[in-house]
């Protein structure tokens, strides 16, 4: 019985060490590949038109910059843009936990005056 416990414990430890979702740095979507880390910095974009922030309010934190991973980190930041709360972050990008583009994506069209409660570009 104790051999079974030891084997299961070692297998679990190996799985956690190799899995990017638990801190292993062996790939992922911009988070791995040579110990690159993705740093997210949200930039508040002025909202034009009638939206939740009113006229000229800063309620659309949509643009994310990432460093130092170059194009891989930019792709990770763009894919995770909808799930990031305001603030500055330094974390590994794990797309299966961070992608949710259902509502907060950029609004395009209608001349930039906003329809349906959000300002457009």
Swiss-Prot record:
Q: What does this protein do?
A: Chorion membrane (egg shell) protein; plays a role in protecting the egg from the environment.
InterPro entries in the record: Chorion_2
Q: Which Gene Ontology cellular component annotation is one that this UniProt entry carries?
A: egg chorion
Q: Which UniProt keywords apply?
A: Secreted, Signal
A single Pfam family it belongs to is Chorion_2
Source organism per UniProt: Drosophila subobscura (Fruit fly)
> Where does the record locate the signal sequence feature?
1-18
UniProt protein name: Chorion protein S15
* Cell location: Secreted
């Amino acid at each position: 019985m104790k051999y079974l416990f030891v084997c299961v414990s070692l297998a679990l430890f190996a799985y956690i060490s190799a899995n990017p979702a638990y801190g292993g740095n062996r790939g992922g979507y911009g988070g791995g590949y040579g110990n690159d880390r993705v740093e997210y910095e949200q930039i508040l974009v002025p909202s034009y038109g009638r939206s939740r922030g009113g006229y000229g309010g800063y309620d659309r934190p949509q643009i994310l910059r990432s460093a130092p991973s170059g194009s891989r980190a930019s792709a990770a930041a763009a894919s995770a843009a909808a799930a990031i709360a305001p603030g500055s972050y330094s974390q590994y990008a794990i797309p299966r936990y961070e992608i949710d583009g259902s509502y907060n994506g950029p609004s395009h069209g209608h001349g930039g005056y906003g329809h349906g409660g959000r300002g457009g570009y």
